[in-house]
Regions:
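N-terminal edge beta-strand
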Residues: 33-63, 151-169
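Short amphipathic, basic-aromatic surface patches that mediate peripheral association
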Residues: 70, 177-191
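Short beta-strand edge segments in extracellular beta-sheet folds
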Residues: 134-140, 249
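Aromatic sugar-binding surface patches on proteins
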Residues: 98-106, 215-226
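Short, aromatic- and glycine-rich surface loops/edge beta-strands on solvent-exposed regions
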Residues: 80, 115-123, 231-241
Length: 249
């Protein structure tokens, strides 16, 4: 076969096959499983522009900070998925930032053991850009009983939002904490009870960003987002029992 014919063959190879040929930088035995389950087997590339920042060791496995930054991909970001590969409940969040919200999320989550952490960013061309990190942990963060439920009066504080808005040069940083036990169903006798939906809205009720949360998120969840410009915003939340909460930010 001539060289020109060989080049033609490689040119006609499907895009997803070329992208999927990349080796996993963390060599995780669970990568292919989550590629199929979370990303539906769609084209991907491991991309250092997607920053996934976690501590090297989780001092408290029930409260592990994660910072996902996809600003290097600019306005091409459609959605961000984050998960901990060896957790009994791997998925942490699914974030659709919208045009007025920066593709950046900071949140706290639980880990059951040392695990690879992934954030996959879908861009407008249909390719997932995957950032990776790893956190070591003594373990037990997912199966530990809730601390919130031991505190008197936690039911009266359910859904209370504490936080603020911090002005920046090109926009605003929203930092908040929501009172909620975030029960994941792994503790005997306590069913799932967790915040599963959140939206950032403008004052007219238009949705600027959506965030789907999973039971891996820590109790009394903390969240940081960035909004472009200096418009007033509101946060709307709902848990899996249908309780709705709202707060001005």
């Amino acid at each position: 076969m001539r060289v020109r014919d060989l080049l033609l063959v490689f040119t006609l190879l499907p895009l997803d096959g070329v992208l999927a040929a990349q080796p996993d930088p963390l060599q995780s035995v669970m990568w292919e499983y989550h590629h199929e389950r979370v990303l539906n087997g769609e084209p991907y590339v491991f991309d250092d522009r997607v920053k996934v920042l976690v501590p090297p060791f989780a001092e408290d496995a029930r409260q592990v900070p994660m910072h996902v930054d996809a600003r290097a991909l600019g306005d091409e970001v459609v959605r961000i998925e984050a998960w901990a590969e060896l957790n009994p409940i791997p998925r942490v969040f699914s974030f659709v930032p919208g045009e007025q919200v920066v593709p950046l999320v900071a949140i706290r989550f639980r880990v059951e053991q040392a695990t690879p952490i992934r954030a996959a960013v879908l861009t407008r061309d249909g390719v997932w850009h995957v950032g990776s990190s790893r956190v070591d942990a003594a373990g037990g963060g997912c199966s530990a009983p809730s601390v919130v439920r031991t505190q008197p009066g936690w039911e009266q504080r359910l859904g209370r939002v504490v936080g603020g808005r911090f002005e920046r040069a090109a926009g605003s940083r929203l930092r908040l904490q929501v009172s909620h036990p975030m029960d994941n169903g792994l503790v005997g006798g306590i069913p799932e009870f967790f915040l599963n939906q959140a939206e950032v809205r403008d004052t007219e009720g238009n949705t600027l960003a959506t965030l789907e949360l999973y039971p891996a998120v820590s109790e009394n969840p903390t969240l940081s987002l960035e909004v472009k410009g200096h418009q007033d915003t509101r946060l709307w939340l709902r848990d899996n029992n249908g309780n709705e909460f709202e707060a001005a930010l």
